[in-house]
Swiss-Prot record:
HAMAP family: Ribosomal_uS15_B. This is Small ribosomal subunit protein uS15. One of the primary rRNA binding proteins, it binds directly to 16S rRNA where it helps nucleate assembly of the platform of the 30S subunit by binding and bridging several RNA helices of the 16S rRNA. GO terms for biological process: translation. Disulfide bonds: none annotated. Keywords: Ribonucleoprotein, Ribosomal protein, RNA-binding, rRNA-binding. It comes from Xanthobacter autotrophicus (strain ATCC BAA-1158 / Py2). The keyword Methyltransferase does not apply.
Length: 89
């Protein structure tokens, strides 16, 4: 369910401004999106797992907050990020 260290490093490299950039909103949103995608697949076969569903809702809320922050700071970066990630927002 969790993402591997290699996948996380690939996301950091793809979405970060420089190598090792883990704090930028783009990287954080990309990692959260990956985790949300994995959990969504988990619920296809474990539909009664309400404990993990609460965790999913927290992740979605955290991603929404980061996207709102990014939209407020720089709308161009926000639009390019949701296009790259395929988030319909």
């Amino acid at each position: 369910m969790s993402i591997t260290a290699e996948r996380k490093q690939a996301l950091i490299k793809d979405f970060g401004a420089k190598d090792g950039d883990t704090g930028s909103p783009e990287v954080q949103v990309a990692i959260l999106t990956e985790r949300i995608t994995n959990l969504t697949g988990h619920f296809k076969s474990h539909h009664k797992d309400n404990h993990s569903r609460r965790g999913l809702l927290k992740l979605v809320s955290q991603r929404r907050s980061l996207l709102d922050y990014l939209k407020k700071k720089d709308e161009g970066r926000y639009k390019s990020l949701i296009e790259r990630l395929g988030i319909r927002r």
